[in-house]
């Protein structure tokens, strides 16, 4: 296992992200799935400069990106977006595309359960078959009930894997989400077994590992027991304290205006209210490394 980090939590030049992460002991990234923002040759050069790799690419499911959409054109466009991420992953030598099937924050169904399931299975299968040709694995990530209504636990993902019936399909296990949804998170992790293709690092409160109540030594021990050898991708995103206790947000959040495209900004607001300050974000990354690195050496 090795220490990795997502890049979507703080929109900034990739070199800034890589320089910070590499200095703290991270050896790879899970790149935000925005092909227009990251060009293969430039990204490869930066990864080489900081002696890092791209472990995975993750779908950023905002706007109209949704495999369960009623509109077939919308579903087709979503599949196309996900295939572009497969191309990005293959071009960067990444092993995994982490796939969230539906728009994050979509909490009300628009069609029958039977139709939604059929559409999601079809979309996931098409993406997975395409990824298999590129020697990339696809890891489906279940989210908690406050971010989605459709795929929220391990059993649902395992059923989706069975129904799609493509060998390169697995699960991206995030203990922040599964601590909410699973009655026994460790048992759920064991049940996944060798289908764990990716693992995210976030506390029960979505702070950094070590700043909540999850038992990280036991979690890492369990990952070893099931044979997981991949990336452990930091994905903490604390809510902004917008009260006087947090300086009305100023202790955690960059001053506005933020130079961020509308879609990314909305995604960040939905998760944490805004753009995290550089020094605050660095402390989050450092805390995660401080907690996890001694457990995997």
Predicted segments, located by residue:
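Noncatalytic linker/hinge segments flanking ATPase motor cores
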Residues: 41-50, 70-77, 94-103, 136-145, ...
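Acidic-and-aromatic substrate-binding clefts and catalytic sites of carbohydrate-active enzymes
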Residues: 8-14, 30-42, 66-67, 105-108, ...
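Histidine-acidic metal/acid-base catalytic patches
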Residues: 1-2, 11-22, 155-169, 179-297
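N-terminal pre-domain/capping segments
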Residues: 1-94, 252-297
